[in-house]
Amino acid sequence: MAQLRELRNRIRSVKSTRKITKAQELIATSRIMKAQARVEASRPYADEITNVLTALADASTLDHPLLTERENPKRAGVLVVTSDRGFCGGYNANVLRAAEELQTLLREQGKTPVLYVVGRKGEAYYRFRQREIAKSWTGFTDRPDYSDAADIGETLVKAFLAGADDYLDDGGPDGTLGVDELHLVHTEFVSMITQKPSVKRVAPLEVEYSEEPQKTLRPVYDFEPDADTLFKALLPKYINTRLFAGLLDAAASEHAARRTAMKSATDNADEIIRTLSREANQARQAQITQEISEIVGGVEALSSAGSE
């Protein structure tokens, strides 16, 4: 009887947990669609600012720091994008592993990594390991805005423009720790099932030269003010756009990973409920069989006593 009561309590407990995981799965499914729509909506702007910058680069003679490779780079900023909440399977573990691999590579190249972290999970990971974080941002990983990317971009560009040569060991007068490179580590959304860690260098920008003829002619612009001024003003915005795209990608990946994890948890709960229900039925059958045996035995004993 005690075993049957325990099994029924466990079934009720698992069913209660299943309600939570199923609700989380449905919420994540709904949010994936919205996150994907935001990723798609941001692409036209990203494509257009890239085209404008390409035209400006052709017309400009400006040697901007964001385009210039530093000699003997000493420090590299690493922005790691994690989630604020859990229940998303290996999402955070995978991106943190990619970040650790990047930092190991940078150290082998003689560069000191400077950590910038997005998300409470990444912040907790590095705090627990007593790793110094230059700056962190939390509270928006599941639905980032452009203003969040602009805030991050302002900090990173400021650190990059300061450079590591000026302040080798400590921050400058305003506390900015200069770096010679900027890297972004986030999760790239491939599909509802597949999300993969991505490592990209954000600055200095890598300019690609192609000898292949263009398939379409680019429009010819007259710039007002001059191309150099516009180029200088748009480059930081381009950095912000790349960061925003990374944040949107990471948000979609987070929701997809959470949906997969919650669906797996719900399926596991269903399997546990089936197993426990089968055990409870067997225990109940055994109990009934025992009760019948006791009744039959009692009747036989009474019959024997009566015949005597």
Curated annotation (Swiss-Prot):
Swiss-Prot/TrEMBL GO biological process terms: proton motive force-driven plasma membrane ATP synthesis
Major location, coarse class?
Answer: membrane
Q: Which Gene3D superfamilies match?
A: 3.40.1380.10, ATP synthase, gamma subunit, helix hairpin domain
Q: Which GO terms describe its cellular component?
A: plasma membrane; proton-transporting ATP synthase complex
Task: Provide the protein's localization.
Answer: Cell membrane
Query: How does this protein sit in the membrane?
Result: Peripheral membrane protein
GO molecular function annotations of the record = ATP binding; proton-transporting ATP synthase activity, rotational mechanism
Q: Which UniProt keywords apply?
A: ATP synthesis, Cell membrane, CF(1), Hydrogen ion transport, Ion transport, Membrane, Transport
Q: Which SUPFAM superfamilies match?
A: ATP synthase (F1-ATPase), gamma subunit
Domain of life, per lineage: Bacteria
* Keyword Cell membrane annotated: yes
Subunit-level organization:
F-type ATPases have 2 components, CF(1) - the catalytic core - and CF(0) - the membrane proton channel. CF(1) has five subunits: alpha(3), beta(3), gamma(1), delta(1), epsilon(1). CF(0) has three main subunits: a, b and c.
Q: What does the protein in this record do?
A: Produces ATP from ADP in the presence of a proton gradient across the membrane. The gamma chain is believed to be important in regulating ATPase activity and the flow of protons through the CF(0) complex.
Q: Which family does it belong to?
A: Belongs to the ATPase gamma chain family.
Q: What is this protein called?
A: ATP synthase gamma chain
**Organism of provenance:** Saccharopolyspora erythraea (strain ATCC 11635 / DSM 40517 / JCM 4748 / NBRC 13426 / NCIMB 8594 / NRRL 2338)
Q: What is the lineage of its organism?
A: Bacteria, Bacillati, Actinomycetota, Actinomycetes, Pseudonocardiales
Q: Which gene encodes it?
A: atpG
